[in-house]
Amino acid sequence: IGNQRTRLLCCEEMTFPNDSGYKRFYSPLFSARLCTNMALYALSKFDAPERLTVGIYDPDAQCTDLVSFVLKYTGNVCIITDNEDVFYDELNTIAEETGACAVVTHHREQLSNCDLVIAPFEIEENLPVRNDAVILTNGRPKENIKGFVYFRYCFKMPNGFALLRPEGLSEEYFCSALYTLGSQYELGSIVPDLCRN
């Protein structure tokens, strides 16, 4: 096992002693892609997405590329981040290329104006969203959040990979390992069939 001892592919129920040095593989990157792909697909299906106000909640500025895709559907975009400078750089490039712009702030209360909130990574704090807002995220939020929160994504795994999946591993977990450890980045283009909570 060697240097892979902290990235073992195993079912969720399997536990290791704390002092063993062994850890179950985990990466949020593939699930974040499912979340953003679902959000973009949903925006593409709205009759008038330009009427929506979309919030992107990305405190660590890990999904700056998402902004340009969301701006194709609506000009009402508010980015909530603790790393505003990273988004300013991205938005300057977008403004030069397309003329589009978005609001960037660290003030969470701006989310109260949003119809849709895209949070590609797990939400670890209570967010001031409306009761009727739709929130797409990655993993169950650590705090109770108002609105319609969706964090589980159902999709069809490509056949070649489906045949390789060991019994006991979920499709999302196995694809996460293929995407992250196996560099199977084509899996990042999967659009979920549905999302649920």
Each predicted region: which residue ranges?
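Flexible, charged surface loops at secondary-structure boundaries
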Residues: 1-7, 19, 47-51, 70-73, ...
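Phosphate/diphosphate ligand-binding glycine-rich loop within oxidoreductases
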Residues: 2-34
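Structural motif
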Residues: 11-14, 56-60, 80-84, 118-123, ...
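Short, charged/polar "capping" segments at the starts of alpha-helices
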Residues: 15-19, 63-66, 84-91, 124-127, ...
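Short internal alpha-helix immediately C-terminal to a glycine-rich phosphate-binding loop
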Residues: 34-52
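Glycine-rich phosphate/diphosphate-binding loop of Rossmann-like nucleotide-binding domains
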Residues: 46-110
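Rossmann-like adenosine-cofactor binding region
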Residues: 103-162
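Adenosine-phosphate binding glycine-rich loop
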Residues: 136-197
